[in-house]
Amino acid sequence: MALAQQFQLNSITFSLLVFLGFVGVSQLIRIYWRLRYIPGPFWAKFTDVQRVFWVQTQRAHEIHRDAHGKYGDIVRFGPNMVSVADPAWIKTIYPMRPGFPKGEFYRALMPYSRQGGALPAVFTTRDENLHKMLKSPVAPLFSLSNVLTLESHVDATIKVLVEQWDRRFLDSQDSIDLADWLSFFAFDVMGTLTFSKRYGFLEEGKDVGGMINTIFTFLKTAAPMTQVPWFDNIWIKNSFAASFRKSNGSSILQIVGKHTSERLKASKSQDMNGSAMSVTKDRDMLDQFIGLAAKNPDLPPWCVTAWTFSNVAAGSDSTAAVMKKVFHSLLSHPNTLQRLMDELIQAQKTNKNMKETPFPSWRDICDLPYLDACILEGIRLHPPFCLPFERVVPKGGIMIGKTYIPEDTLIGMSPWVINHHKPTFGEDAEDWNPNRWMGPEEEKQKREAAILTFGAGKRICLGKQIAMLELKKIVATLLLTYEFEILDPERYEVENWWFFRQHGIDVRVRRRSDKE
């Protein structure tokens, strides 16, 4: 009797195991079959785990590039994720019209607090209607004409940087980690533009309060989660799980909230009309955000916090990454540095305004062709964000060349892969070569349109004009003010956690006037 019962129990267990095995195998076949005709690494057919491992290596951008080199322009990176390497398809995947919503990838980049939940922003929201609601009021603030009303804030920050270098390094001839100081500059610029108040990184010569490290730690945590966003919902954006750990996104929100609440209190006694078209000179961006929120009562109550968070978290490190690449490349390639110096010195000699002002104005340098070429080459070679910008294929699917991509597939392009596309940028696409931008204007415009650094289509980065203002001004000013000696070009190090972080640009500086 006992033997019969044991046999019956074993039969039930066996049947259950067979059923579960059948379900598991069927699921694997279903996952594999959907995109079976798209080449890619073996494990990408069944799981996203290898995508997490790629991010954890800190060199996912190189792995993605190598995968495209092996499998072609269209590669399966995951069971439901396809990467495209040819810039010719940028307008298809990132159109100006609605229809290609962002994937769950972006939810992992939203800061989270137990009290307020996940905070959407213009960059991270997947909701097309919410994106339009958040973007439309602030878009005029990021136009070049409005950004130039804030140029004096950039000049004030440059002045502090120059004063600190003169005081700290000219007499001692101590080396400078230029990478750190460019980060300090970029953050203090955004602090000044946003709050009319620097964070104090330049004055202190360090990451005051650990703010830069906090943002990087947040991104370091979020980057792997972007590859498995379902796990982010369980482990990060979950109030129960959040109670057992410190949220880095919450720390950044506290910084933003402090500045915002102080300004809101101060603004109650002021007359604010909120018009982006009537911005007065030197009025900072937080003032303008608050004014716009007051003028648009239909906006969500957290909109000022979301706009400000984007400035603080994304508007600094991204620009600093390109600054570092431009300076490292110039200092490592003396011939291109000399050509740029010749152009800047000639402009200074022939431009009365450049002679009479301490720092070059945007008007004085915006059209210098070789400066423009160097900035574009830095933007191309080292985009700050280097994982694919994921989108969801709309109903009916799409054709990429002769390859059909079914609806609901995640599709994306990595800025690193796109910007290093050899058929577009030349066989030397991996190398620093500003001359590629000095050819016919038509060719230059075609290549510029192929750069994905700032995104594309209706979700293109709002802060592009601010970045260009900072880049051209800091490169021109520092090169005209100092002579640089790079100590070890090979010490340059890069970490990729969605945002890049670079170290090891050790230099010595001396005033140009000291030698001349």
UniProtKB/Swiss-Prot annotation:
Q: Which InterPro entries match?
A: Cyt_P450, Cyt_P450_CS, Cyt_P450_E_grp-IV, Cyt_P450_sf, Cytochrome_P450_monoxygenase
Say yes or no: keyword Zinc present: no
Cofactor dependence: heme
Where it sits in the cell: the answer is:
Membrane
Q: Which residues cross the membrane?
A: 9-29
The cross-references to CDD domains, in alphabetical order and at most eight, read: CYP57A1-like
Q: Which residues are glycosylated?
A: N248, N273
The UniProt entry lists membrane topology as: Single-pass membrane protein
Enumerate the GO terms in the molecular function aspect: heme binding; iron ion binding; monooxygenase activity; oxidoreductase activity, acting on paired donors, with incorporation or reduction of molecular oxygen
Role summary: Cytochrome P450 monooxygenase; part of the gene cluster that mediates the biosynthesis of xenovulene A, an unusual meroterpenoid that has potent inhibitory effects on the human gamma-aminobutyrate A (GABAA) benzodiazepine receptor. The first step of xenovulene A biosynthesis is the biosynthesis of 3-methylorcinaldehyde performed by the non-reducing polyketide synthase aspks1. The salicylate hydroxylase asL1 then catalyzes the oxidative dearomatization of 3-methylorcinaldehyde to yield a dearomatized hydroxycyclohexadione.
The entry sums up its family as follows: Belongs to the cytochrome P450 family.
Q: What is this protein called?
A: Cytochrome P450 monooxygenase asR2
GN (gene name): asR2
